[in-house]
Amino acid sequence: YRARSAFTLAYRNIRFKGTGGGSEPEGSVDLGQVPFDRLAAYDARHFPAPRPRFLAAWIRQKGTCGRAVLDDNGMITGYGVIRKCRSGYKFGPLFADTPEIAEEIFLTLSAQVPGEAICLDTPEPNAEAVALARRHGMVAVFETARIYTKAIPDLPLAEIFGVTSFEVG
């Protein structure tokens, strides 16, 4: 693969599709209540480069809802965004320290869009992310390859339950 294209395959992403709705668990807060510097720092742990300007614009898009889970000290342990697309809604990013936190954020955001088509793009190596999607009745609709021209970044894939977008990562 690399010899022909100069790209190295890191892993596959899987897009899962389902329907929004359900009960909203308690415990998460609106992203607007989170100090932006903390959000940007948490995001930077899960993406190969700092992206504060992008992130500020991303979470403020029209038709977007973002939630975070905080620990007892007010530190972020997970956050997620769901945004309106041409057809339905897409999660991304969905980053969390544990599968339980990811599930809480997923359920909270899904509850915001009852009856709407929803998509979650998961990195295949995160088996907990794949299980989360399947547990909520989502089905795989297609896959993409995450490729790089240089070194593959050392990202905590076990904490990446939904990529920001296939185009961005």
Predicted regions and their residues:
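Active-site/acyl-donor-binding loops of N-acyltransferases
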Residues: R2-S23, R83, P93, C119-G169
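Short, high-confidence coil segments that cap the C-terminus of an alpha-helix
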Residues: T64, P114-A117
